[in-house]
Amino acid sequence: MSNLLLIIDSVSQKIRDRRKLEEFGQNPDEEIESSLKDVRQELQKLNEEQSRLEKNAQIPEYRVRESEAFLIRMQRRLESAEEEFEKQRRASSIPADGTSAFSANPQVASTNNKLTPLPSLQKTTSSSEGSDIEMEAMYPVDGNDPDPINVNVLAQMHQQMLNEQEESLGGIEASVQRQKRMGYAMNTELSEQNVLLDNMNNDADRIERRFDHAKNRLNKVSRKAKQYPRCFIILLLCALLLLVASI
């Protein structure tokens, strides 16, 4: 289906650019006719595939209707392209006297016959005319849209987008889990550091109390020495004698 869409888009663009190519001295008619022939062959294959789908009871009805709607849509686009091609050829083949070259040139007339749709495609279109209204109600076509998107293609694109979003969400979830584990590890480390700081504060308080106690003793000794200077000198000399004697 995608190949057929590409071919129709390509031949439609060639038809639109036909006049510009003729101005540069090129003749794209043979290439356009070949492309139109390829489109008819692809439509013939789709017509045969549609017949097989309709005969297969295991195929869901919506699948058959989607395929039929796509086939009708492509047939209409082919007819529109052929009509535009014929209009341009008629316009470019009318000489100054107003007579048409198609009536005088049998080769051009035979080429005209090549552009008629295949009988099998005419049969498919006529057999599906009764369900055109239903098909258009189920799959409305925007007249301004040159390339309507098939429902299956749209569903596949939507599913692919959902899968990509799911993968992205999975990556985000894994990243959040890693950050969560890192947060737990940092919390544990901070708790250990808090315990260590508490122990250091306790040790500092204990040392400070010892210094205060020693300071109080020194102050007490200093007051005693001021009250009894002679006794203090005697005690100091005795301490020195004991120290010398021990050496």
Swiss-Prot record:
It holds the Pfam family SNARE. Residues 88-130 are annotated as: Disordered. Its main location: Golgi. It is found in: Golgi apparatus membrane; Prevacuolar compartment membrane. CDD domains: SNARE_SYN8. Residues 27-94 form a coiled coil. Keywords: Coiled coil, Golgi apparatus, Membrane, Protein transport, Transport. Gene3D superfamilies: 1.20.5.110. It is a peripheral membrane protein. GO terms for cellular component: endomembrane system; Golgi membrane; Golgi trans cisterna; late endosome; late endosome membrane; SNARE complex; trans-Golgi network. Involved in vesicle-mediated protein transport between the Golgi and the vacuole. This is Syntaxin-like protein fsv1.
